[in-house]
Amino acid sequence: MKVDLKQVEEAAKELYIRALKLLPPDVKEGFARLDAAERNPLAKKVLGTMIRNIAVAEATDNLTCQDTGLPIYYVTIGRDVEVHGADLEAAIRRGCARATLEHPLRSSVVHPITRVNDHTSCGIRMPAIHFAFSERPEELLIQMIPKGSGSENNSWLRMALPAEGVDAIKAFVVDCVIEAGGKTCPPTIVGVGVGGSADLCVALAKSAAVRPLGSRCEDPEGAKLEAELTRAVNQLGVGPQGLGGDSTAFAVHVELAATHITMNPVAVNMQCHAARRASATFTPKGVTYGF
């Protein structure tokens, strides 16, 4: 399957705008579950305000949050897809800039030292574009995540020792949620990476944070850890926006990687309550948009 780069550019633009305006169905369902179970009156009121904000944004074709975030694209390429990687990356970059200039959107991207903003949401190594490969022959999947600073500023890595065991992982995750408090705009999706090298562990935490609600870690030990950590986090009483309550997190998601015999790294990356994402799937039949 040959990829039309003009279509890719248009999709990259459309995905950024869609992600900022339309919340995925699984997140809306997550809100409904938390609202039904919440016992704290103030927390219930805060959840209701969040739910109304999402509905109003959708009805008025507005953004769910003023923070347009850092633009992150995950690209999965099927084995029979014909495309030049550099051309694909350039098309996504053009689409990202067009979304910002043509919508228009606030550009949240600046030079890390000079803090200069060129108002395109692009810059050095930005948008962040991550490539993976799939056995699905004629399919190209592009997923867009606008990552807000409230959740992204609350990211951690700890190079734990194997002798500390699983209890150290659990304690670290719980401590991170406590330290974050309301700064991540909870209820959050808590992404946890365990294992690998330092850089891989952090990347796993990010991919865990942006997984759909209801998904489970493929490894049974990871899935067990997810359930235990979700219970632990929601017993902390942080609550929506850090104002107290049962609804601190929609879920804790865990991703694992094999690691060195003398290491056990653990990383935490969070997604705020506006858990925004959008996707485009390219096949020989055309382009399909989703989440």
Question: Residue spans of the language-model regions?
Answer:
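Non-transmembrane, aqueous-exposed alpha-helical and coiled segments at domain scale
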Residues: 1-192, 197-291
